[in-house]
């Protein structure tokens, strides 16, 4: 049996760190690989041939040699996951839907897939495989019991193209003991944390070490949900690295009560945990109590962050605005806290009510849910929550202002200085060989620091801890993270200005002049709708290299207007012009997240469109 497992492309967000991946990190395409698919592959029968394709780092095959296709997805991937399921099903493939959103809302997939797998896969996926082999697969496999993680196999890391990611991922535990109102983790995994054995984790590290991987993210939603189990794990990791004379670099998500356990902090430091991500949400104690985040109220949050810094462990933070207790003044409180804390990777999101969560059910009762296409992604400029003490537009405007304030060059530099004041002897010392480190710093300087002019250079130089060289790698990482987030805000949070339209109009006119002959002959159709450019190519005669080079240059200029988007439909093309299209797409790849491409079904095997860079529209194919 031939199984193709696909991880759909994520919509870009702060978590993508796109600027860093594209311009600074060496030969990387994404941050984390799809661990769930690697685990699913390990649960398949030994006789099955399994392939994993992650659309975030490679293009999807349009006509794969597969007997069935599984497409996973989180909520933010639902739109693309739906497109892929529909496309492959229309081509005659048996398709299976899975992932966290299918686990939370399997009913959303009833018309999209032949089979839906909902819940943890360790028991239900082997059952599906056996029944599929016998030709009697059901439409829904739902885990309703408790999965013992001792039954979870070593993921098939060998099926992942790990060299394309900045980290590898492992999972020690599932579940969280806390009761945050907005969180879907306890809905899916429960409040009683379960964990793998130390032997299982050592087996996974053996597999990664054999592949040359030593940078690892524990994807547990709360690694210290059971502190005693976490301490046992950490002692095991320390001994494992000593025994094998190797040094891993670890990071994970934890709750803020880590700061109250000196033994746990020391163990994390000794085990080489260089960073932790903490859901801080709000500095306001009343807001934390209202949303049931009581673990954050037991000690001053700023003091807790600094206590973690004292052990050389960096803190990444999650924050939320739009709680019921929030007013417009709350945004100033968030700003002051984030600046004082020194947290560079401060992921601020709009309060979003995920289906099946206590928050969703409460707001539904109160009639305070909005319809929103972005209700599954709280970093977009939309939410499904009706705010209580401000207007919806006021919420969005204040959110944008907050991020713009946080991501000025001055604010980035100030947070670094605040952090380094408390972060002693950082665990993080760089994660690449020395030649690659020099290359990263070089690219940061020329593509990030110097590109920002003398002012940014001045801020950068004033953050370098010249007398504490051990802190320099962390300073470099913070500048990379800060500039990546700044780039995202500049591209996605920018108000559309009437002044943009003349720029579009001038460049559009220049494009029409260049391709005028083809327009008049009907071989090219061209239209604009505000900042959306629609172009259709129906080239029934040889266009030639010069045409495609001029087209690439003019479209590149048009797309340099930040809000401009392009939908390119290729209806007809001679084989001798394929090289021209390849050059066109290569030139436009840097704008790929704003370019949608539609191919005539007869051209899908002739024209190579990298769906990991462009949005390849599958349900809108030209006839």
Please place each PLM-identified region on the residue numbering.
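Radical SAM [4Fe-4S] cluster-binding motif and immediate context
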Residues: 153-316, 323-336, 364
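Acidic, low-complexity intrinsically disordered segments
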Residues: 1-215
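Flexible glycine/acidic-rich beta-alpha junction loops that bind and position SAM and/or redox cofactors
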Residues: 10-19, 105-108, 227-228, 286-291, ...
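A short helix->loop->beta-strand "cap" motif at the edges of active sites that frequently abuts
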Residues: 88-94, 246-248, 273, 313, ...
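Short, electropositive alpha-helical surface patch
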Residues: 61, 66-68, 233-239, 327-343, ...
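Structural recognition of alpha->loop->beta junctions
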Residues: 108-127, 267-275, 333-348, 583-596, ...
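Glycine-rich beta-strand-to-loop/alpha-helix junction loops that act as flexible
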Residues: 96-101, 218-221, 571, 600
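Radical SAM enzyme core and accessory elements
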Residues: 2-5, 12, 26, 49-52, ...
């Amino acid at each position: 049996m031939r199984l193709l497992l696909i991880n759909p492309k994520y919509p870009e967000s702060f978590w993508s760190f796109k600027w860093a991946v594209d311009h600074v990190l060496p030969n990387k395409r994404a941050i984390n690989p799809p661990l769930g698919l690697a685990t699913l592959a390990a649960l398949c029968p030994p006789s099955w041939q399994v392939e994993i394709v992650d659309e975030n780092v490679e293009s999807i095959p349009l006509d794969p040699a597969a007997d069935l296709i599984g497409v996973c997805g989180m909520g933010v991937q639902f739109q693309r996951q739906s497109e892929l399921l529909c496309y492959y099903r229309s081509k005659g493939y048996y398709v299976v839907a899975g992932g966290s959103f299918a686990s939370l809302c399997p009913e959303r997939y009833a018309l999209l897939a032949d089979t839906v797998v909902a819940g943890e896969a360790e028991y239900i996926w082997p059952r599906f495989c056996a029944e599929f082999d016998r030709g009697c697969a059901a439409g829904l496999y739902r885990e309703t019991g408790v999965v013992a993680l001792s039954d979870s196999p070593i993921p098939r890391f060998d099926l992942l193209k790990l060299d394309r990611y900045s980290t590898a991922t492992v999972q020690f535990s599932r579940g969280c003991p806390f009761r945050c109102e907005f969180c879907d983790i306890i809905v899916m995994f429960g409040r009683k944390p379960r964990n793998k054995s130390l032997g299982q984790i050592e087996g996974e590290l053996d597999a990664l070490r054999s592949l040359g991987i030593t940078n690892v993210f524990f994807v547990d939603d709360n690694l210290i949900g059971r502190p005693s189990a976490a301490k046992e794990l950490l002692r095991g990791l320390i001994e494992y690295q000593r025994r094998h004379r190797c040094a891993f670099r670890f990071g994970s998500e934890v709750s803020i009560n880590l700061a109250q356990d000196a033994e746990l902090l020391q163990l994390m430091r000794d085990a080489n945990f260089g960073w932790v991500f903490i859901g801080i949400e709000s500095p306001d104690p009343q807001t934390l109590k209202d949303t049931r985040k009581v673990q954050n109220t037991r000690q001053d949050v700023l003091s807790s962050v600094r206590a973690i810094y004292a052990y050389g462990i960096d803190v990444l933070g999650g924050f939320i605005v739009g709680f019921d207790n929030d007013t417009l003044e709350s945004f100033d409180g968030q700003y002051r806290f984030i600046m004082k804390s020194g947290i560079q990777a401060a992921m601020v999101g709009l309060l979003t009510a995920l289906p099946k969560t206590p928050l969703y059910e409460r707001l539904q009762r109160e009639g305070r849910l909005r319809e929103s296409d972005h209700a599954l992604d709280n970093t977009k400029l939309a939410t499904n929550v009706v705010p209580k003490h401000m207007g919806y537009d006021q919420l969005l405007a204040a959110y944008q202002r907050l991020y713009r304030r946080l991501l000025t060059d001055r604010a980035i530099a100030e947070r670094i200085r605040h952090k380094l004041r408390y972060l002693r002897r950082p665990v993080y010392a760089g994660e690449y060989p020395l030649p690659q480190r020099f290359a990263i710093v070089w690219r940061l300087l020329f593509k990030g620091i110097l590109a920002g002019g003398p002012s940014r250079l001045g801020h950068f130089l004033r953050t370098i801890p010249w007398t504490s060289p051990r802190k320099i790698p962390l300073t470099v990482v913070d500048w990379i993270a800060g500039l990546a987030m700044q780039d995202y805000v500049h591209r996605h949070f920018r108000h559309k200005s009437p002044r943009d339209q003349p720029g579009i109009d001038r460049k559009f006119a220049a494009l029409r002049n260049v391709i005028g002959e083809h327009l008049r002959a009907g071989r090219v159709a061209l239209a604009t709708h505000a900042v959306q450019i629609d172009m259709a190519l129906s080239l029934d005669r040889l266009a030639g290299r010069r045409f495609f080079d001029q087209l690439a240059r003019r479209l590149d200029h048009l797309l340099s207007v930040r809000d401009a988007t392009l939908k390119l439909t290729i209806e007809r093309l001679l084989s001798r012009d394929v090289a021209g299209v390849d050059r066109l797409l290569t030139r436009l790849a840097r704008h790929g997240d704003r370019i949608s491409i539609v191919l005539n079904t007869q051209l899908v095997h002739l024209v190579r469109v990298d769906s990991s860079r462009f949005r390849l529209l599958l349900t809108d194919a030209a006839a």
